Every structure is written in structure tokens, then in C-alpha cells.
Amino acid sequence: MLSAFKCKNQNGGIPVKNVIIGQSGGPTAVINATLAGAYTEAVAQGADKVYGMIGGIQGLLNEKYADLSQYIIGDRECDILKQTPSAALGSCRYKLPNYEEEPQIYEKLFKILDKLEIFCLVYIGGNDSMDTIAKLSEYAKKIGSNIRFMGAPKTVDNDLAVTDHTPGFGSAAKYIAASVKEIICDSSVYDLKSVTVIEIMGRNAGWLTASAALAKDDDCCGVDLIYLPETAFDIEKCADKVKKLLAEKDTVVLAVSEALRDSNGEYVAASGSVYAGLDAFGHKIMSGTGQFLANYLGKTLGVKARGIEISTLQRSAAHFASKQDINEAVATGAAAVKAAFNGRTAEMSVIRRIFDNSEYVYSVETADIKSIANIEKTVPSEWIVNDNTYVSDEFIKYARPLIMGEMNIIYKNGLPMHLKIK
């Protein structure tokens, strides 16, 4: 059972060790499990207080934070937090400028951290969040601050370097594969020629789109074609392949990345609504690729065509999260805090894959943040096969262990319970 905090300054004169945890970027089904892991480890390490940033670094700059002990009262609340989707603390897409450009932001932030007597800051996020940790740790070193800055990985895109995979990917892959399997069943009901295009998230990395291949099993034929953003997309060549498949079967199902680009690097649906502006880090906000391609194939081939955008469901379906993913999310959060208490800073917790007699085993370590921040990991080219229209068995072996297991969900009035913070 989680115990109440005891101020160590009142019990032996040990310096205050307050911890603050933040969440940043797009949420996942298990980002709150990472928060739970970080929180419980901070309690176990004897932190005096554990704060949560409300709205990430941007919120902290506005002095928005909460004492997490007021919300995570015991094991039950912690378990509910683990099954809560989205980011319980709130998130942001705030690009921290370089110190030389706006030193006043750093000065303000460190003044707030000093006021809260923060010993360790843990930021749960993806590439851009690790960039924030790198900048803050560099500034701390520059001014001689003893605050430790640690990152914990999070992204459904699975594009973080060094770590074998990222918490959030396994649950999203599980939801995508199950949804694809069910869509294939639904699309084959009628005796008529049809095409279904399923659009899946992933800006430059096709890990999530590739996970559609996991649907194939003894009871499912699987998708017919998979198109990833790692390779150039030829819409006419795609139409030819679909036409040939329709000559052999009534229903063709495609899984496509939201960010397909042609050989010139242009988004294939640029004439439609493929993106709607930029986020704070200059990334295009995607949407519309699946519908654009469905419209094109329907018109070109003269068949019924439907575009399905799984959208935020793939990252928010916490009720269907992978147990393996949740366990690893908890472990990475705990590892980041433990490393800080062991004197580490400017690092991120990472997952190492270990194979023991073909059984999936993992360990959690930490790695230098500079080897991770602003580096993007994509699907290996040798895993993209069949003229760039499918993925190899190596991908299946890589991804399958990450979607295994289900949690025992706590329900209320027939629906999963969620923990509200803020």
C-alpha cells in the first residue's frame, strides 16, 4: 500500500528531495502507467513531495502543478491511473527555445523549480520532449544547479532511438491489429467488389501502419497491402495492384500511413486535406490520406471504396491496452526516478530486448539523452518487402510480444474508471 509522505527534514535533517513529473506531446494508452511508475518509485525512494506539472513545461512556466499525493492516495488510485487514457496531467507541444535566444525563460523555470525545492524532474514524452530534457540539463550544468533531469519514453510512433521500442506502441499496435481484423470481417459481408483503405498514424515512421500485419492469423487473411512512409508511394502503381487483386477476390483492404509521400517527397493527398498547419515543433498535422486514396481508387476502378481513419482511437483505447506495454511503461517511469536518486542526470530510461530460448525478455536501463533527442528511428528497409507493399516476418517477431496480455480493468457503471488530476 502506498504510504503517506514523511518530510525527511523533520526526521533526521536529510535534505529535501522533491520530485516533479511532467507529460508532453501526444498521449498514449499507457503514458499514465509511466506516471504511476515514476510516482511510486519516488515514494519508495523517500521523496518528500511528488508534484505533477499541469500541462507540461508550458504549464510549469505558468506555475501550474499539483501535489500528486492528493490524488494517488493508495494502490486502487494507482491502478485506476494505469488504465486512464490520455495524459492525466495534461500535455503541451511547447518548443523550449535555446538558452542563448531567451535566457529569461530558463531563469524563470529554474526559479520555480528552486521554490518547489525540486531535486529531480522527470519528463515523459517522445523526441521533442527529450530535446527539452537535453536543453534543461545543459543549462543546469552551465549554472551549477544540482537538479537532475531525466526522460521517460512515450510515443505510439515508436520512433525513439536507442530504446528497442517505446511504451505506447504495443497498446496502439494491439488496438490497430484488432480493429483491422474486425474491419476485414465487416468488409467481406457483401458479395460485391469493394476496397477499404485504413489510415493509421505515424508521421515519418511506419511502425504503427506495419502493425496492421499482426491481424493475419489462422482466422484472418490479413490486409492485402501495407504502405509505409519509409518508401515512396506511387498511386498509379497502387491502383494497378488493387485492380489485380479485385480480379481474384471481392474485397481488398489496404493499411496506409497518414503521411504517404511520392517520389518527389510530396504528400500524396496534398491537394486534399492531408495536413492542417504545423505544431510548435514545425511538424505537419496530418489527416485525410485514407479518404483521399479511397476516393481515387473508387473512381479509377469503378468500385465501392471506403476510407477509415482510426485516428486518436489507436492511442486512447486504454481499455484494450497490452499488459506487456503497461508493465514496461511502469518500469520505465520507475527507472528514470531510480536513476536520478542514484546520481544520474541527462538520461532517458530505455528498454533492452533479451532473447532467452526464443522467449521475449526485457530489461530497463538508461542512456545519454543526447543519443536520443531529435533522432528518429524508422522501420528497417529490409523489413519492408513485396515491392514495398508489406512487412517481413522479422517485423512480426519484433512486434508480437509487445501486444500480449490484457489488464484486469476496474469498472464503474459498466465503463472503465479514470483518475482525474487537475
Question: Residue spans of the language-model regions?
Answer:
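Accessory alpha-helical/coil subdomains and C-terminal extensions
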Residues: 50, 112, 120-125, 131-143, ...
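Short glycine/serine/threonine-rich phosphate/pyrophosphate-binding segments
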Residues: 28-38, 60-61, 105-107, 127-135, ...
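C-terminal non-catalytic interaction/assembly regions of soluble proteins
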Residues: 270-422
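Glycine-rich oxoanion-binding loops at beta->alpha junctions
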Residues: 63-119, 128, 167-169, 181
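Short, Lys/Arg-enriched N-terminal segments with co-localized hydrophobic residues
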Residues: 1-15
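Short, ordered loop/turn segments at secondary-structure junctions
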Residues: 24-26, 53-59, 93-94, 126-127, ...
